[in-house]
């Protein structure tokens, strides 16, 4: 890891986001444990690499509305454990909301940030991932997102 960081530094390249996209809401205990453990390792690696943020989504598959409800408490548990580790290591982490995942919309995203209440938790904002209905008033839609969570991007 140290050599990777050094090679980037020699080329004056700053690693902005270390992507570690894991299945954090999966109800399968073994899958979720592996996801949390892997993300924790990336948080630790980041102490060496020095990226601004270690980022993830909260699932892999496209989930139905019912599946998102089932996966939600598992996601919350995983995120809480990761935020605790990020705080312990003094490293920032970020979540990326995706319409098809348990972290699916503004309401759920606000809930996560309020419950976690950590300066170490940030947000990756890819508008295409949260736009369910493109025919809506996008100006109002994005304004709502940015007013609620713009300081977390």
Predicted stretch roles:
Residues 2, 7-14, 24-125, 132:
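Active-site acidic/histidine proton-transfer and metal-coordination neighborhood
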């Amino acid at each position: 890891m140290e050599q990777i960081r050094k090679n980037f530094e020699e080329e004056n390249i700053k690693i902005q986001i270390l992507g570690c996209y894991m299945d954090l809401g999966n109800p399968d205990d073994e899958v979720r444990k592996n996801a949390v453990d892997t993300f924790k390792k990336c948080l630790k690696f980041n102490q060496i690499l020095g990226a601004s943020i270690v980022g993830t989504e909260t699932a892999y598959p496209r989930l139905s509305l019912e599946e998102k409800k089932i996966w939600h408490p598992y996601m919350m548990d995983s995120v809480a454990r990761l935020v605790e580790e990020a705080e312990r290591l003094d490293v920032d982490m970020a979540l990326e909301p995706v319409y098809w995942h348990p972290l699916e919309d503004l309401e759920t995203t606000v809930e996560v940030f309020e419950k976690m209440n950590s300066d170490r938790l940030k947000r990756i904002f890819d508008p295409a991932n949260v736009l369910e209905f493109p025919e809506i008033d996008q100006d109002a839609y994005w304004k709502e997102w940015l007013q609620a969570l713009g300081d977390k991007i």
